[in-house]
Amino acid sequence: MKQWSILLVFLSLSLSLSAQQGYEKDVFVSSTGDSLPYRMIRPESMKAGKKYPLVLFLHGAGERGNDNERQLTHGGQMFLNPVNREKYPAFVLVPQCPAGSYWAYTERPKSLFPADMPAGQEMSSLTRTLKQLLDTYLAMPEVDKKRIYIVGLSMGAMGTYDSVSYTHLTLPTT
């Protein structure tokens, strides 16, 4: 039984490491000095003159931190899957929400029902930094500004919900 446990630990570690290996690792610093660790993958075989969609993936609360690795725990391997990469070539950004922060809202809403969500809140510094990161990639000529996808799970889904309410977050500045 002990051997199986050890095998499972090594197997889960190897899956986690393989999810990290295909991603570029970087830290974005905003114009106000706020930093946001993120991972990114590019389309495997980019063709000159072709534009590719951009996918922004927002992770859940359990992956917050500053190690620039935990945000790949759920979903990281899916974007690296060779079949998916060939069939759906895209730029994929996977930022990491800092520990103690919440995607998009200035503070976590007390109710998670859409009708009770706070409306008209000012963007948090994290959201502004995320917007600047997004704008950096939207300025690239290879990115199709008409195909921007924001997806998330759990806390990231709430960030997605909030992000699309800020039209200026999902629309390029230029």
Regions found by a protein language model. Give the residues of each.
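Sec-dependent N-terminal signal peptides
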Residues: 4-13
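Active-site machinery of serine-nucleophile hydrolases
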Residues: 65-125
